[in-house]
């Protein structure tokens, strides 16, 4: 029960041919959206159809269709050529057997046999190989031969001079001192700008701090110079921070215009600054020590001079440093 008769080879070939034709014919039917109008196939569908038909024609010309497989698409079904089977007569069969028997009798017997070879010994010890002798394989290689001893003169490591260490410490102290004075001067400039800002918004007769009468034991003082402990101290440094941010914003805007160079003003400004830097760099000394001495001298003059002189020296320092950068 439930058993089916076995299919013959011809039936299986016909079924396989039908499956192959179904797969090839499925590629020729357009699938999905054809075009925006839905009437004509797209170029991809046409090319796929042409490629499929070429494959079908190639298989048909080669006679690869099994028997009965061409009925699905109406193609011609050439029958494959059968291989002719050799027909032997009893006399020819007897002659072949006699010839093979004589060949076996006249064949020379095997006299020598090759004994099975033992696996090679990859690890050779000194004395096992006559070519090596008492030396190992690494010792005979020219890359591993020991070179004659060369006398090496060892020099003691150079001790650091005391002057170099002292110079580094002195340079660090000078850097800290200059940074401290620069911070003080920046705060002083910010306080002057804060004072100018307050003078524009307050009358001259009312420049006293409004927080000195809040009950704290603080001596009378002006706005912008509040000591530690006065409630106006935090407001003063808040104004200084806002002024500093405004200066950074203006500087960033100028740098943006200078880097882009999209406006005529930026191009003219860059051309004038380049000409100024080139003229200043031509006047600067080429010795690095002289340049460092010049910059240090200008810094000392700036830190110990009045406001007008400080402004001029600051501009000179900026021009000098910019010229150094432009020259390098």
Swiss-Prot record:
Domain of life: Viruses
Protein family per UniProt: Belongs to the avihepadnavirus major surface antigen family.
UniProt feature, compositional bias: Basic and acidic residues: 92-109
Organism: Duck hepatitis B virus (strain United States/DHBV-16) (DHBV)
Localization in the cell: Virion membrane
Biased composition (Polar residues): 76-88
GO biological process per UniProt: membrane fusion involved in viral entry into host cell; symbiont entry into host cell; virion attachment to host cell
Residue(s) at site: Cleavage: 238-239
Keyword Metal-binding: no
Chief localisation class: virion
Topological domains annotated Cytoplasmic: 2-236, 185-236, 304-328
Protein name: Large envelope protein
Residues carrying sugar: 260
Region Pre-S, annotated ranges: 2-161
Function recorded in the entry: The large envelope protein exists in two topological conformations, one which is termed 'external' or Le-HBsAg and the other 'internal' or Li-HBsAg. In its external conformation the protein attaches the virus to cell receptors and thereby initiating infection. This interaction determines the species specificity and liver tropism. The large envelope protein probably also assumes fusion between virion and host membranes. In its internal conformation the protein plays a role in virion morphogenesis and mediates the contact with the nucleocapsid like a matrix protein. Truncated S protein may be involved in translocation of pre-S domain through the virion membrane.
InterPro entries, alphabetized: HBV_HBSAG
Free-text comment about domains: The large envelope protein is synthesized with the pre-S region at the cytosolic side of the endoplasmic reticulum and, hence will be within the virion after budding. Therefore the pre-S region is not N-glycosylated. Later a post-translational translocation of N-terminal pre-S and TM1 domains occur in about 50% of proteins at the virion surface. These molecules change their topology by an unknown mechanism, resulting in exposure of pre-S region at virion surface.
UniProt KW Zinc-finger keyword: no
Modified residues (Phosphoserine): 118
Complex formation: Large internal envelope protein interacts with capsid protein.
PTM annotation: Myristoylation contributes importantly to DHBV infectivity. It is most likely required for an early step of the life cycle involving the entry or uncoating of virus particles. Phosphorylated on pre-S domain for about 50% of L proteins, the L chains with internal pre-S region (Li-HBsAg).
Chain spans, region Disordered: 63-128
Lipidation (N-myristoyl glycine): 2
GO cellular component: membrane; viral envelope; virion membrane
């Amino acid at each position: 029960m439930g058993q089916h008769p076995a299919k013959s080879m011809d039936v299986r070939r016909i079924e396989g041919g039908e499956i192959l034709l179904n797969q090839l014919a499925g590629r020729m039917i357009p699938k999905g959206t054809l075009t925006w109008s839905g009437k004509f196939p797209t170029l991809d569908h046409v090319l796929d159809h042409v490629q499929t038909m070429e494959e079908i024609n190639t298989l048909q010309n080669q006679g690869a269709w099994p028997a009965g497989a061409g009925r699905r698409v109406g193609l011609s079904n050439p029958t494959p050529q059968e291989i002719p089977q050799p027909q032997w007569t009893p006399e020819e069969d007897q002659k072949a057997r006699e010839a093979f028997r004589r060949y076996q009798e006249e064949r020379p017997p095997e006299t020598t046999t090759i004994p099975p070879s033992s696996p090679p010994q990859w690890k050779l010890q000194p004395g096992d190989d006559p070519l090596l002798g008492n030396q190992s394989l690494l010792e005979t290689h020219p890359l591993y031969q020991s070179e004659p001893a060369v006398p090496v003169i060892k020099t003691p490591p150079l001790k650091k001079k005391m002057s170099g260490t002292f110079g580094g410490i002195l340079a660090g102290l000078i850097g800290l001192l200059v940074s401290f004075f620069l911070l003080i001067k920046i705060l002083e400039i910010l306080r002057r700008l804060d004072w100018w800002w307050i003078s524009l918004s307050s009358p001259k007769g009312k420049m006293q701090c409004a927080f000195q009468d809040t009950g704290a034991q603080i001596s009378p003082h002006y706005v912008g110079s509040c000591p530690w402990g006065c409630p106006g101290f935090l407001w003063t440094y808040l104004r200084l921070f806002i002024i500093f941010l405004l200066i950074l914003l203006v500087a960033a805007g100028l740098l943006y215009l200078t880097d882009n160079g999209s406006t005529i003003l930026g191009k003219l400004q860059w051309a004038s600054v380049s000409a100024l830097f080139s003229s200043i760099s031509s006047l600067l000394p080429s010795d690095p020590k002289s340049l460092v001495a010049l910059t240090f001298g200008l810094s000392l003059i700036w830190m110990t001079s009045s406001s007008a002189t400080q402004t001029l020296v600051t501009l000179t320092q900026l021009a000098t440093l910019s010229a150094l950068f432009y020259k390098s």
